[in-house]
Amino acid sequence: MCIRDSKGSVINLHPSLLPSFPGMRGIQQAYEYGVRITGCSIHWVTPELDAGPIIDQKVVRIEESDTLESLTKKVHIAEHALLPDVVTRLSKSEISTP
């Protein structure tokens, strides 16, 4: 399926708090930039990279002791919590499509 043919019905799970750090290396970029919070976002897919309307986000705090590896694990845990919640809300029509 092509994104341009999806009529706004495709969601994406992204490993940053969009609009910050779009693209494939969101966790690494947040870590290298030195921000104190990051997280994950679920958004509607549009032709523009990671620019669709945001459905929901989950915050992850970056501790002084975090390594890139530990931060990656924390963001993945947040993603695994957020995605089923959003899918459930979509299935119950609690979230409208764009």
Segments predicted by a language model, with ranges:
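Donor/substrate-binding cores of folate-linked one-carbon enzymes
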Residues: 4-98
